[in-house]
Amino acid sequence: MLAKTKHQATIVVKPTFRAVATASVMVLHGAANAAEIKVLSSRGAEQAYRELVPRFENETGHKVTTIFTGALDVQKRIAAGETYDLIIMGGSGIDDFIKAGKVVRGSRVDLAKSGVGVGVRAGAPKPDISSTEALKKALLSAKSIGYSTGNSGVYIASLFERLGIAAELAPKLRQTPTGVFVGSIVATGEAEIGIQQVGELTHFDGVDFLGPLPAAVQQITVFSSGVQVGANEVEAAMHG
């Protein structure tokens, strides 16, 4: 059974984290005793992930230590040689790591799906974003627009081009540094409207979530996990 948050097109979580984390325990030499599982995760599925991890820890006695950061920083950390048991990010990123020999082939597990959503500062007027035309009007009327360097930011930049409004919006775009929530600049008023993965906006203090992008222009990102090559002699552990 799939569990959903209260917002449609937001995050759909498969209850498979136990299986993924159990696989990482295999990586830790099949230890029978409580193990520490090191996870590097992008922020897109953070809320859903945080809901699953305590249950897993209580059921198994294993400890999960997680670093949450932006997708670009995940790539930089792995490129710099940092080692973890599991990596969680957009599925395409995991696939790229597999091709590069950084993640064990066959270890990818899809964990969650997330759409892109829109938010404004708490208490601010709430523009209509229920249709593509309404969204365009809201964006063109906004004094400033926040978006991220992650998957949603790449998509949003291409969407502005597709809608034919990129040039008009360019002077008022505010892109957050990697690992920084768009909600943080919406909450302070630096950005009048913020656009990011739904799970990164719905639980941010100081932000009123307007809803997901209209279906016609929505993009769903699949967040996946993969076992990092070289983590605790992973090949021997998985095949031994």
Please tell me what each predicted stretch does.
Residues R18-H29:
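Bacterial N-terminal signal peptides
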Residues A34-L72, K76-A80, G91-G101, R105, ...:
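Exported/periplasmic ABC-transporter solute-binding proteins
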Residues A3-V20:
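Bacterial N-terminal signal peptides that target proteins for export
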Residues Y84:
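Dinucleotide-binding Rossmann-like beta1-alpha1 core, especially the glycine-rich loop
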